[in-house]
Amino acid sequence: MTNEKMIFRNRVVDKGQLRNLISWAFTHYGTARTAVMADKLKDLGFRYATRAGVSISVDDLMVPPSKRSLLEAAEEEIRATEVRYQRGEITEVERFQKVIDTWNGTSEALKDEVVTHFKQTNPLNSVYMMAFSGARGNISQVRQLVGMRGLMADPQGEIIDLPIKTNFREGLTVTEYIISSYGARKGLVDTALRTADSGYLTRRLVDVSQDVIIREIDCGTTRGIPVRPMTEGSKTLIKLSTRLLGRVVGEDVIHPKTKEVIAARNTPISDDLAKEIEKAGVAEVVVRSPLTCEAARSVCQHCYGWSLAHAKMVDLGEAVGIIAAQSIGEPGTQLTMRTFHTGGVFTGEVAQQVRSKMDGTIKLPRKLRTRTHRTRHGEDALFVESNGIMILEPRKEGSETPAPQEIHVTQGSTIYIVDGQQVKQGQLLAEVALGGRTTRTNTEKAVKDVASDLAGEVKFAEVVPEQKTDRQGNTTTTAARGGLIWILSGEVYNLPPGAELVVKNGDRVETNGVLAETKLTTIHGGVVRLPEATPGKSTREIEIITASVVLDQATVTVQSSQGRNNYLITTGNNQVFNLRATPGTKVQNGQVVAELIDDRYRTTTGGFLKFAGVEVQKKGKAKLGYEVVQGGTLLWIPEETHEVNKDISLLLVEDGQFVEAGTEVVKDIFCQNSGVVEVTQKNDILREVVVKPGELLMVDDPEAVIGRDNTLLQPGEELLGQVATELRYIQYVESPEGPALLSRPVVEFAVPSNPDVPSTTSVSQQTGRSIQMRAVQRLPYKDSERVKSVEGVELLRTQLVLEIEQEGEQEHNASPLAADIELIPDPEDADVQRLQLVILESLVLRRDIAADATQGSTQTSLEVKDGDTIVPGSVVARTQILSKEGGIVRGVQKGSEAVRRCLVLRHSDMTTLNTSAKPKVKAGDLIVAGTELAPGVFAEESGQIVAVKNAGESTTTQDAALSTQNYAVTIRAGRPYRVSPGAVLQIEDGDLVQRGDNLVLLVFERAKTGDIIQGLPRIEELLEARKPKEACILAKRGGEVKVVYGDGDEAIAIKVIESNGVVTDYPLGPGQNLAMPDGSVVPAGQPLSDGPSNPHEILEVFFSLGSEDGVYACASHALQKVQTFLVNEVQMVYQSQGIDIADKHIEVIVRQMTNKVRIDDGGDTTMLPGELVELRQVEQVNEAMAITGGARAQYTPVLLGITKASLNTDSFISAASFQETTRVLTEAAIEGKSDWLRGLKENVIIGRLIPAGTGYNTYDEPGMLEDYSTLETTSVLDETDDPLDMVLDDRTARAYNLDSPGLAETGFSNRRSILDDDELIADEIHDLVEAEVEVDDEVDDDYEDDDEDDDDYED
């Protein structure tokens, strides 16, 4: 090499150049020399970095001077937009959209400005050098330092339309700082969440692909996959040469022009060859791929190609599965979790802006199909319906005419100019939609609410409301046609419920004039009593007494115990009642006032209650007790219950044992009665111990007496030779001594039908209303209820209940009457206190309130005096609502809605303009700001013309004709809001609204960036093969598209007409937009609407197309389509984030997801329907069936997500160590699975050497240790006690010369096709065992059978 000339190149070496340099050295000179070179480069770099001492100081941050003008231009544009919004030319959504796009554009422009400024003024600036050499930082960070920080998103992903205009060099304002922190926090949180997600993704990937190891040199397949450059629209994401590097050619590559072979089949493609192929202009190359490799359970060397780490063919035993998993998982952290839902996409990504190259005139050809279209900024433009061209005719310059320029516009483009328009150089002509499948702009429906900025009256202009009722009967009003909603200003008052207006439309009110009043009326009438108002607090309550009753027979005494007063009432016949309601409280109708103090119905213990003849009211609240309707007898069978809840070991007696009173039944618990013990326990916890008093009668013949269980024994009846003297209750028990009957005592309580307490009634004189204290008897327990208690309980309570006769209350919504309990001294004897019940209605007065934003001030006046007697319905007080400002009353609505409103049109709402010329407007017109009212006179604000007066006419002089006419135009201020068609209206024409009320919900479509779920979630969705949320519609068969339009121009369905005339209908759901124009031809499996494709559906469509070559070819074809789809989609996501991953890694993973099929019908094979089997395995079995003439297995290809695939691997050890351990292991145990220890995981878990890398040959290479002779092998086997429980480990495995010539005759070698080499180990050992050791025959047969089955399963 010495004689060659040294080449010197002068160029800047930045990060990219360095990369190329090292990779070139690596491919040409190998690892060692590259390492030395890299080391030298490092030293060089450090040396000069030290010399240069590059650092960033504040002075290095140079802000481009053009920033100011850029910002001013943006603000100007935004001001213009704001004016258009104020004038009602664009909707709120369009304004927001425009603001965001403007700022985005400015931010981008500023970024470019920063770069050029650095380049021109100071290319050695340290910031510039660092960012652009790739040493540290990138352009987006530099932009924040010296450009502008830009727009931030809030935590919901909505963009805040207030940009951060400053950069970190200038410093942020307080507002900007807070918004900035708001957005930055989101970034941090996202990153934290991301790492966990990405780690889990890597784990799943490793699990699904860990057993993919290079095991063969060449599988010999002729299939391959076509590779073409990956493009998005017109820009190439991955060049063909990049995609080809390191692959092996699958079919000869032919030069398109010279037709000579550039690369023969099975040639690995090196860097140079890849470039050569690309240079030759080959469109696509068929390469071998892991997806089409036919090696069983692995990938062969040729199908995998280069190991990218060494740039040479991959070695045998390389664990490519794990490498693939790590390659895909590692960049996961770099992917963004979610893209921001911007309200709309930044145009740069979806449309390409076409600007005119020169001044000239635009001509739109007649055949260019366009329709008018409103852009998302509310501008009018033309929407191109089919591909075509527009022509720019340049202006003549001197003598020669430059050639007209043709501009191609694709379907879906937007043209911003009209035919014949003059354009300047650099003017925006159109946005051309980029073709290509991936950029079908997905749109989603979103809503934005518009709130009113001022109070006033609603007036619709051009808005056509339309009502729809859905199935639930909710009606929504939408705008069928868009238009303006005007709010004409005025003061709106919310009237309280029940207020009556005292003014009419058109009345004039003064400031503090009365608008409305509410009256406070009494319902029941009676005597007015005003409680003594405490000083300084005006009276709020007015009480009206309607009836009262005094218990004149009873006296009240007070006993106080423990600081609480108990009031006892003693009646004439010395019955003592306890007052339940204390004096001074209100008692509602039906509430208990007092309770009889009575010991007759008290029991000593708990027990069991039965009713004999007693009837209670069915409907009654259990907590109040049940009212007795019919008297009778209560039968009480006492028993004492101890609730224990302790450990069973503390029990000192047995179940069924008879105990004396005072026995300790449980530690520290003694029983009070003698009787039989019943113990309830649960889980060795003692729940309760019941002692049932009574006598035990032993029984010899349980059958005879079992019928007496739970019966009553009447006095005089005989039982087991004893005559009963009193009523007993008989129960059958199993005591420790044997079966017995327990005869239990019964206590009887007589209950009278009517209580022996008089009821008191009183009738009010004025109103004829009656009030009474009714005595009732109440039982707290139901029939046959068990009362668990040790102490006694009350079985019957006699209570006095207040009942007010409510006559005719129902017509006016009566406040339920309450009675006040009061103690009054007896008129004759002052020492005796009597109980008085007073029924009163209390009315609360409104407080006077000062005016607030929505209500006028109120004033309340009282109309009655203390002690007046008033009739029902008379007015007690009235409240007046006063207006805040004078004006004219308008918009009083008829109707009785909950909130009634009225509007006062104030003087401040109107402006009057004088003009000498005749106005061009008339009263009632709605005008926007800037409208010309009369020649030379313009409106300053929007509103409605109220009046046009001619002031000059009043002159009565003769020369009236000559005098200048004076006109006065009065405008009522207003505010227009534009409404887009389809918006949901939340108000009606003529409504009155307060400031801040919602007017409409604007429904708009916002484009999703490529896909809202970018990044990790999208990759997870693809690899887990989830169905996307809004999947697109796929054409099941190819054909011509016909679009069916419903009412309006909404496409509602698509028809696809096949070549043979078959028509398939595809209805379009809401939010699905056409992707195919009318009349275009689609191949099968092509999306008809936009949205992500559902991979399962792709598989189904292509599989259902069928194929002449049988089901295997068909399944392979369908799977290949899905595989290509998945590989490309995953690549798309990584590419959009600027991450390069070699296709082969993704292919290895996708192969694992698509290698299974679901058996539909097993035919004559041993496979069961529903079983998941590898495609190649089924095919082998089917070939065997074809030879023997059996029925083949029918199957459908399935796509498994990585988790599913991991759980469905052949190796149960691997699956169990991944997820759902118990399920996997139990299934494996039930099915009697064997694990052939093929993958890495299984071997690691068991502790063997892993079959990859250096450990690969240990299990696979024949004739490793030839010095062991066959005889020794036998002796090794003889030493094992039971040949069937032999464990293979590394040391013993090596001792077997497994492929010695002597074994060939046993007939194993001819099964090679079905078996994998690994399997031979186990089988041949078994064969040795069979040949040379006497084995029990039956065991052997079983073993054989198992083995056969296993082969079927495994392979």
UniProtKB/Swiss-Prot annotation:
GO terms for molecular function: DNA binding; DNA-directed RNA polymerase activity; zinc ion binding. The keyword Transferase applies. Residues 1331-1355 are annotated as: Disordered. Keywords: DNA-directed RNA polymerase, Metal-binding, Nucleotidyltransferase, Transcription, Transferase, Zinc. The keyword Nucleotide-binding does not apply. It catalyses: RNA(n) + a ribonucleoside 5'-triphosphate = RNA(n+1) + diphosphate. Pfam families: RNA_pol_Rpb1_3, RNA_pol_Rpb1_4, RNA_pol_Rpb1_5. GO terms for cellular component: DNA-directed RNA polymerase complex. Zn(2+) binds at C219, C293, C300, C303. This is DNA-directed RNA polymerase subunit beta'. It comes from Trichormus variabilis (strain ATCC 29413 / PCC 7937). The gene is rpoC2.
